[in-house]
Amino acid sequence: VLSPADKTNIKSTWDKIGGHAGDYGGEALDRTFQSFPTTKTYFPHFDLSPGSAQVKAHGKKVADALTTAVAHLDDLPGALSALSDLHAYKLRVDPVNFKLLSHCLLVTLACHHPTEFTPAVHASLDKFFTAVSTVLTSKYR
């Protein structure tokens, strides 16, 4: 459960990210593919070379979904229901991959915002990404 302090940290961080969310999403996805090569199996039709336009475009989709989640912190299941359906029923993404991407998102944000990435912000973002991952995998059962 996200506390009021977590919600404040998440919204504040997302405000600071601003127009870079799509870039950071692409970078985190790149980082995921490089660090955890098995994640590439879901994208056989993509050019997965670092910085590819397809990876950047999908990273923007990830960032857009997270921006939606930030705007609906009190109703993540409602805000992400369609995305949960897509990943569970059509794409059948292994749930562990959400954890791997979450880790890479944290690393990417820490690299770009080292001063703002305090232990409290880190913990809040980790809880947020875990909550989003939980929603996205909730329909697997």
UniProtKB/Swiss-Prot annotation:
- Gene name tied to this protein: HBA
Could you provide one GO biological process annotation from this protein's UniProt record?
hydrogen peroxide catabolic process
Which sites bind heme b?
87
Tissue specificity remark: Red blood cells.
The identity of this protein, by name, is Hemoglobin subunit alpha
Pfam families associated with the record: Globin
Which molecular-function annotations from GO does this UniProt entry contain?
haptoglobin binding; heme binding; iron ion binding; organic acid binding; oxygen binding; oxygen carrier activity; peroxidase activity
Matches recorded under Gene3D superfamilies: Globins
Give the miscellaneous note.
The sequence shown is one of two non-allelic alpha chains from dog.
- State the similarity comment: Belongs to the globin family.
Cited function: Involved in oxygen transport from the lung to the various peripheral tissues.
Q: Where is the Globin domain?
A: 1-141
Please list the residues that bind O2. Answer: 58
Positions of post-translational Phosphothreonine modification: 8, 108, 134, 137
Source organism per entry reads: Chrysocyon brachyurus (Maned wolf)
N6-acetyllysine is found on 16
Cellular component (GO) terms are: blood microparticle; haptoglobin-hemoglobin complex; hemoglobin complex
